[in-house]
């Protein structure tokens, strides 16, 4: 009897320890952040950070930054922003593209870098969730290696689950018009996530997410289309000669991505092409190609966020879970990731059929994902043109060019823009503001709500 009692007590203690462990690890956390190290005074906006667990046992903990709209959070749209990569932190969007703060561009001297307010934050008229995804990015993490191997389709499902749980804890935003946005590799993730949300709204999940549409900047969409557009783009921007371009077209027959290894003449021409373009900064061809350690280099600003985020006072202010403590990287390319969506064009087609609005925009000096390729896959959708190609203006100056289609898709270029919104943040903000408010970029007012 005594042994049975001891065994019972021992098992009870093990169960209690297990329950405590689960309680510590499976309770989602959220914290209101009133101030941040490096920023002078209280934050002039409402910031919340936290983790949402996804998976059967919430093995994956996704970290987010949530900023309420500065205009009317009760009614303004709610936007989920997904940074590209895959493997680039939400901080990239928040501090460099469309958030209310950015790094002050001072040379690092060993002290904590400073933050300053921006004038172009999309949170002026929308509430925004900046999400660290896929798992292993930023401060998101998995408790087991089994769940630390993300994929395109798997992340779309995780993001959908994240949204369901997040909205369950923030029910005051459940009726707000909801959008998903991103850039670069998010051209794969966002359309898949939109389709996953749409499918969930019809099949399983109540209350449904009030999904209205999505937006993408310089989106990676189809590796073949994107890759094959770089040579005609280079010719159009006078990066290669007419003679080289004509030879490439004739000898390679328009196929520059998957070249026949026996077509040695084509391979030699591609070497010549690379000689002409390899020294360019591909995210914006007018910017110099230089090292991140050089304070005069554009990308030096990225090193400042590395110093800032890895400071212990910043991690404490952001309420970072100790399980995810490690060296933070703005973009971590070393993580395993399965690219199981070859082309997101079918997802765009399905989302159009379901009636969702979309804004696709391209910085016209991006060599990574040239606007020519984006126009090719948009054309492949075979939707009628509603509004012809025309300039969109800011203060009577051309800010880019735009065209709209019968599937509620708007395409726009950003004049002087690069691979992400950060190269023309003011212009991109005005473009976003017009579109999210239901206006055509050139001024006509249109209905905002998706019709059922």
Swiss-Prot record:
MF terms from GO for this chain are:
serine-type carboxypeptidase activity
Task: Name the source's superkingdom.
Answer: Eukaryota
Question: What is this enzyme's EC?
Answer: 3.4.16.-
* Annotated Gene Ontology cellular component terms: extracellular region
Positions glycosylated per UniProt: 109, 125, 350
Cross-referenced Gene3D superfamilies: alpha/beta hydrolase
Q: Which Pfam families does this entry report, sorted A to Z?
A: Peptidase_S10
EC top class named in words: hydrolase
Which tissues is it found in, per the record? Expressed in seedlings and roots.
BP-aspect Gene Ontology terms: proteolysis
- UniProt family annotation: Belongs to the peptidase S10 family.
State what protein this is by name.
Answer: Serine carboxypeptidase-like 6
